[in-house]
């Protein structure tokens, strides 16, 4: 097999960086790495984790697999990683808001901050307010008016308790005094199935999950949680345009491992993933999916995790998320 000149340079640079690391970090990885995902296959976390796994595997010449361990809104996978050996071979790809909300709602057996070693942000998600293609609502205002008239209010589907989609939708409905009932699914794909068939009135899926259904008319977009309008949906307004800037939620997704991972190992893993994020195919796929690549230092990510935990403890009370 012939290596490209660019890849040779990347491998050489990575090799030189290893010389300054302690032995455990220098030897990493010597066997396959597992990326744990707490939601069902086909959702934004799963899809993007698999894209990263492919890019990382190509960069380091070692197998990287994705394992879906669903349950408790991602809590089962998070608890599994928290209890894993801090050797870098079992890592978690997760939503910052959901990771904090599940324990804030009393539905988890892990420590959202102290139980994990932050590595780096991976990507941001953009979510879009969608209704079935045959819904009478063509704007957010019309949807909310329907909810006020409908017995029991709107039915709201989410990809999981504490997901950005869940928090965003609930905050907007409460701010606009719209009655609603929430159904939580184990990921974006099962939620989308019920949204398309009209079993739920609306949801806030990610662009990557919903774009094909928007294109063929099975779903209709009413609003977008993004800094600016998205080119493929030029007529869909942003939340800022609609007057809901204060209801926006954090939408970062990140990579973490068990607490106790040596700093040099954390640094090595971070460098591997940042180098992999420069893969042209990965960049192309994430751009198409409306999930821009982002990165951070472990310290920056740690502060963000703490901020999310502080925020979600308050939101759990405001949104009545606390479970027995």
Regions inferred by a protein language model and the residue ranges of each:
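N-terminal (or domain-start) structured segment
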Residues: 25-114, 153, 177-206, 213, ...
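An extracytoplasmic/periplasmic, membrane-proximal ligand-sensing/linker region
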Residues: 30-32, 174, 241, 263-324
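Beta->alpha turn/N-cap motifs
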Residues: 93-98, 158, 188, 205-210, ...
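Short coil/turn segments
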Residues: 40-42, 96-97, 132-137, 158-163, ...
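A ligand-binding cleft/hinge motif common to bilobed small-molecule-binding domains
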Residues: 97-107, 171-175, 202-236, 313
């Amino acid at each position: 097999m012939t290596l490209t000149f660019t890849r040779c340079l990347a491998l050489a640079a990575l090799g030189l960086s290893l010389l300054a690391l302690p032995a455990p970090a220098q030897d990493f990885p010597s066997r396959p790495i597992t990326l744990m995902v707490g939601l069902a296959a086909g959702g934004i976390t799963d899809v993007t984790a698999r894209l990263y796994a492919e890019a990382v595997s190509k960069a380091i010449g070692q197998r990287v697999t994705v394992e879906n361990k669903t349950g408790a809104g991602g809590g089962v996978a998070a608890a599994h990683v928290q209890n894993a050996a801090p050797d870098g071979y079992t890592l978690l790809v997760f939503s910052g808001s959901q990771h904090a909300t599940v324990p804030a709602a009393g539905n988890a057996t892990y420590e959202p901050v102290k139980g994990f070693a932050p590595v780096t942000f991976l990507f941001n998600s953009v979510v879009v307010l969608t209704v079935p293609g045959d819904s009478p609502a063509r704007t957010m205002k019309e949807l909310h008016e329907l909810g006020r008239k409908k017995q029991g209010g709107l039915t709201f589907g989410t990809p999981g308790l504490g997901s950005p989609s869940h928090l965003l939708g609930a905050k907007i409905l409460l701010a606009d005094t719209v009655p609603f009932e929430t159904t939580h699914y184990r990921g974006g794909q099962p939620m989308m199935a019920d949204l398309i068939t009209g079993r739920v009135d609306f949801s806030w899926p990610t662009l990557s999950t919903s774009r094909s259904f928007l294109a063929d008319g099975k779903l209709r977009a009413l609003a977008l949680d993004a800094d600016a309008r998205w080119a493929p949906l030029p007529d869909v307004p942003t939340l800022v345009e609609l007057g809901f800037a204060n209801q926006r939620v954090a939408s970062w997704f990140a990579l973490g491992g068990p607490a106790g991972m040596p700093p040099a190992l954390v640094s090595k893993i971070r460098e591997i993933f940042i180098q992999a994020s420069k893969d042209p195919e990965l960049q192309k796929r994430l751009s198409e999916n409306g999930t821009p690549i982002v990165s951070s230092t472990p310290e920056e990510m740690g502060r963000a995790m703490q901020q999310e935990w502080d925020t979600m403890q308050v939101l759990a009370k405001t949104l009545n998320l606390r479970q027995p």
